[in-house]
């Protein structure tokens, strides 16, 4: 099932932020920046990606975690959450 773009705006915003952070990390590597600075930015980008994933899962639970009959499918929900681990 496809989610509406408006439902995923928060996740998209986080992904765009992470994209900027990743580009910044690449630039820092090219410039030979200190590894401590790199690790700080890597941590921030990783957190942004993780939160975007959780936002997508939370938004999609009502859509993706239900059977065609409209009943909750626990296995689908667990699989979606475990994919983020």
Map each language-model feature to its residues.
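Solvent-exposed interaction patches of small proteins and small membrane subunits
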Residues: 1-85
